[in-house]
Amino acid sequence: MENNKTSLVTLPGAIIIAGTIIAVAIIFVNRPVQNNNLIDNTKSTNETKQINLSPVTAEDHILGNPNAPIKIVEYSDPSCGYCKIFNSTMTEIMDQYGPTGKVAWVYRHFPLDKPDQSGYVLHPNAGNESRALFCISTLGGNHKFWEYQKQFYVMTPSVTSQTPQGLDQKQIPILAKEIGINTVSLAECMNSQEAKDKVSADYLSGINAGVSGTPASFVLFDKTIDPTTISYISNALVQYRIPEDLLFVSADQRVISMSGAMPKALVVGLIESLLK
C-alpha cells in the first residue's frame, strides 16, 4: 500500500481498495486473480447503473422506522472482516439517525460460502452464521435479531490471515442463550429448509441487484435524487479515491449503490445531502 495513491490489491476471491487514511474494501465472489495494477474505472454505462433491488418488505430485518425516507439495504457476510467494520459504521449511523425516524437499516444475507472454480471456499462458516441470524429473528423476533447481530459482529474475529477460521461456531448457541434464545430450537431451525431457503433468497436477490461481494449496500430514497447529492457523490469519488463502479446513482435516480466498507464521514455526508 502506498500513501497518496489509490491502490488495488487483488487476491483469490478478495479485493481491497485502499487510500491514504481510510480503507474502502469489499470481498468479492469468485473474483478472478488479476495483476496488481490499477484498473481504469472511469467509464460507466447505463447498463451497469441499472439496479434491480427487491423491495423492502415486512419479511426483511429492519432496524428503525420502516417508513423512513432513507433506507440503507446492506448485503452482508457474517465472516467478512470488512462487513464487521461497516457494521460498526452502520451502528453509529443508526445511533445518530435512527431516533429521528429518518434512516432505517435493512440487513440481508449474502454468505460467501460457495466454492469458486478451483474449489476454494472463502468463508465456509458464513452460511451457518447467516442461518443463525435468520433463526434468531424467527425465534425471538426483530428486536432479538438486532441484539444478537450487534453482539455477534462485535465479538467475531471474522476471517483474516491471522484468524482464517473466523468465529468458533460453538460460540453461536452460547451467544444466543445469553440473549434468551432456546438453543435446542435454534439448532433445529438452523438445520431447517426454511432457514436455508431464506438465506438463499436473500443471496439471489443480491445477485439480481448486481452484488458481487460484501459488504454491498443500497441507499433507497423516497424521492428522486437531486443534483446536490449527485455532486456530493462525484466529489466523494475524488476525495476518497473510490472507483466509479463502487459508488454510483442508479439510472432512475432513486437508488445509490455503495460497495465496500465506506467510511462513516462519507455515509453521513450522503445522508445529509439527501435530507436537505
Task: List where the protein language model places each region.
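C-terminal cap of thioredoxin/glutaredoxin-like
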Residues: 2-30, 75, 170-276
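Extracytoplasmic/periplasmic mature domains of Sec-exported, cell-envelope-associated bacterial proteins
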Residues: 24, 49-53, 59, 124-128, ...
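N-terminal, intrinsically disordered, polar/charged segments of Gram-positive cell-envelope systems
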Residues: 32-61
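Functionally engaged cysteine thiol sites
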Residues: 46, 116, 127, 135, ...
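Conserved beta-strand and immediately adjacent loop positions that scaffold enzyme active sites
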Residues: 59, 71, 215-216
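Short beta-strand-to-loop junctions in surface cap/lid or active-site-entrance loops
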Residues: 60-68
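Structural alpha/beta surface segment adjacent to cysteine/selenocysteine redox centers
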Residues: 68, 73, 78, 84-177, ...
